[in-house]
Amino acid sequence: MDPKERIKELREKINYHNYRYYVLDQPEISDYEYDMLMRELIELEEKYPELKTPDSPSQRVGGEPLKEFEPFTHVVPMLSLANAFSEGELRDFDRRVREAVGDVEYVVELKIDGLSVELIYEKGIFTVGSTRGDGIVGENVTQNLKTIKSIPLRLKDDVSLVVRGEVFMPRASFEKLNEEREKLGESLFANPRNAAAGSLRQLDPKVTAKRDLDIFIFNLQKIEGRKFKTHIETLEFLNEQGFKIIPIHKKCSNIDEVIKEIEEIRNLRDKLPYDIDGAVVKVNDLEKREILGQTAKDPRWAIAFKYPAERKKTKVLDIIVQVGRTGALTPTAILEPVAISGSVVSRATLHNEDYIKEKDIRIGDTVIVQKAGEIIPEVVEVVKEERTGQEREFVMPDRCPECGALAVRLLGEAIRRCTGLNCPAQLLRGIIHFASKDAMDIEGLGPAIINQLLSKGLIHNIADLYYLKYEDLIQLERMGDKSVKNLLNAIEESKTRDLDRLLFGLGINLIGSKAAQVIAEHFKTMDNIMKAKFEDFTQLPDIGPKMARSIVSFFAEKQNVEIIEKLKNAGVNMKKLSKGKVSNIFEGKTFVLTGALESYTREEATRMIEERGGKVTNSVSKKTDYVLVGKDPGSKLKKAQELGIKIIDEKQFEEMLKGENI
């Protein structure tokens, strides 16, 4: 068969099966058969690149990472909806509508708790997708939206239209994603809506493609060459074109039927596989919508009814303290199990010790618990009239319950944090940070390998990395002879890193790379840093009382001193390497870097400037002398041009390093 014809046939087959699987949930072929069709299409398109088109289903896998999202002005403003929280407010809305246009039919729909987007199709082909933004201008996230398989890349008809929909993440996918993030020591998403928003706004579409996002289309914003009388007709048309439309859209003759349907949706809420935060009421007649019009913020023909967060009464059986991956100690209430929003709740967050004091929460109290989309519900109120006198006050520990290290609460902060390098709760994240590029830069030591090392008991702290042997690493998954030797060489090479890189790698709370440089430059050795007192640190530039307290508390912890000693015994450098200034050619000069540099990393360019007496800052101001511009610069370039700051490229920078054209 002619390649062009075969590609056309494969696209039609894949689009058909995508629709059966992702929209109708009625697959006709196995995953393997589908994968074979997709593989053949990709191979043919690679062989004949001139036949590749933007609407091909092969384009869903995700393109190249973006530097930033481009702003996009919506074809039709994406207005928000006015809210109603009671039956009375719904009846007020109905009265206003009927006063303006007479009796009306309404449509009641689910209000999906996700991220609103606009999709534009030209002659049946998906061309642009954007987030809501401020309602007038959003962000162009077309490449990311193409990875959502329930969004058709080509419609049934060659029609030009604009639709609005809600991108969301099903609860099961959300739970799976958080499980994976927890294993990698990454921060958890608070709820499916946050996960959906974070996933859609990834600069790398390949990340979005892995996140299992879905969409429901709920409104036809604009269409060329066709007319419809009602909202229901538009939904039926969109369904025929291949869109996954909002699953519940009930036509109601009057406000009483609307209120009844909203209550039915409330009862259904917990059984749905995705989150909703209410119901939307819309006028069905499109001509009457035109008459009703809109305010600057919202249409007069629609309103959102928001369900209140469900609250239940239960008892606090105990209060325990959990340690997060950043070392934060969080008090958690152990509750008498109670059913809320479709799940049995047996624990609730108490946030921090101030929250407990403010609410006067005690062990044994009867409390009101609320679940409002968070992973863990929260205690919102104490029923003090039910106290018996047997309740016990809770005292926040000053030692970490996981490792016994000192738990420090810095002045002005609500959170108490563990200072222990050995703390199992924060070990994965701590080692990932220690091995990162700006710290010890151990090439090849990523989260997956660190996870294996920890789970097999081969390491228990950062110092153990320097005692790993060939036979330890060769047993790990995906580690062959060459990769083991490369990793051992990378670990060995990291021993020579400068003192500030090691200090930053320890992950001391509030001590970033810049502060680590200031401290290392002043004290010269790790021993001097460990012996220094609070006031010794506060005298340094850019080191405030909180940072000083944090670093003093860190080195007051015995287990941390032992790990430093272990690092020292392994041969890790503990001194500020005396590089000295290469020259003073940039003395008194301030630089700003913007865009991706080709010849060096930002860190390398920064060091080159500082070694020659210059200073690097993050923002452009009148005090800036030079802006070094790389590929795809951001807004800093524009500001530099407006202020008349000298702009240099890498070639000019290299000439300046030689002492030329300064």
Swiss-Prot record:
Alphabetical list of InterPro entries matching this protein: BRCT_dom, BRCT_dom_sf, DisA/LigA_HHH, DNA_ligase, DNA_ligase_AS, DNA_ligase_CS, DNAligase_adenylation, DNAligase_N
SUPFAM superfamilies: BRCT domain, DNA ligase/mRNA capping enzyme, catalytic domain, Nucleic acid-binding proteins, RuvA domain 2-like
E.C. designation(s): 6.5.1.2
Catalytic residues as annotated in Swiss-Prot or TrEMBL: K111 (n6-amp-lysine intermediate)
Residues that hold NAD(+) according to the record: D31, Y32, E33, Y34, D35, S80, L81, E109, R132, E166, K282, K306
Cofactor annotation: Mg(2+); Mn(2+)
Highest taxon listed in the record's lineage: Bacteria
GO molecular function, one term: DNA binding
Disulfide bonds: none
CDD domains: BRCT_DNA_ligase_like (cd17748), LIGANc (cd00114)
Catalytic activity annotation: NAD(+) + (deoxyribonucleotide)n-3'-hydroxyl + 5'-phospho-(deoxyribonucleotide)m = (deoxyribonucleotide)n+m + AMP + beta-nicotinamide D-nucleotide
Entry keyword set: DNA damage, DNA repair, DNA replication, Ligase, Magnesium, Manganese, Metal-binding, NAD, Zinc
Segments forming domain BRCT: 581-662
Annotated PROSITE patterns: BRCT, DNA_LIGASE_N1, DNA_LIGASE_N2
Family named by the database record: Belongs to the NAD-dependent DNA ligase family. LigA subfamily.
Protein function: DNA ligase that catalyzes the formation of phosphodiester linkages between 5'-phosphoryl and 3'-hydroxyl groups in double-stranded DNA using NAD as a coenzyme and as the energy source for the reaction. It is essential for DNA replication and repair of damaged DNA.
Protein name per Swiss-Prot or TrEMBL: DNA ligase
Encoding gene per record: ligA
